[in-house]
Amino acid sequence: MLVRFRLLSFWRAGTGGGVSATLDSLCARDINGLPLIPGRQVKGLFREAVRELEEDLRRAPPGTLVQLFGSRADPDNPLPDPPLPAVLRFSDARLPEADRVQIVDRPELVAGLFQTRRSTAIGPNGVAKPHSLRFGEVAVPVTLATEIDPLADAPGNWASLLRMAMPLIRAVGSGRTKGQGRVIVSDGTV
């Protein structure tokens, strides 16, 4: 299934790293330096949306989350059940091929996909807290695409369950609760 992420605001799918004294956080990039959402983060977004669909909204059958995304071993259980594997494979969400071809050999266009944002923590007295200034790289709003593929054990309704979960994914990456990474997720056929 082809899935599109239409980013509506600046966003960062972080790498967990920075660049010495210049940037505290970096955007994930592909081998050509273009922004992406790693497949692992895509999976996490869908996992949380399906959890909400099943547990909070009760619009998916009980057990759907484990059926699609598998389970982990429970170290607190003296007689643990073996973990169940996931039945879906998630790829990195990248710029569409037509866009990548136009941009990849033009360093000025690649650089234009990113900006640096500054932030600081404000104390109760309305003044910036000491040593709280941060510089983070963000990507400009773009549309990314990814493939989600079923494995042999996937139930027949996996795609319809993920389509129902798509509207529940409202933001991606870091800063989601602060307005960054607002997104519309849709089936690629739309």
Annotate the PLM regions:
Residues M1-V190:
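Small/polar/charged residue-enriched interaction surfaces, especially the RNA/DNA-contacting tracks
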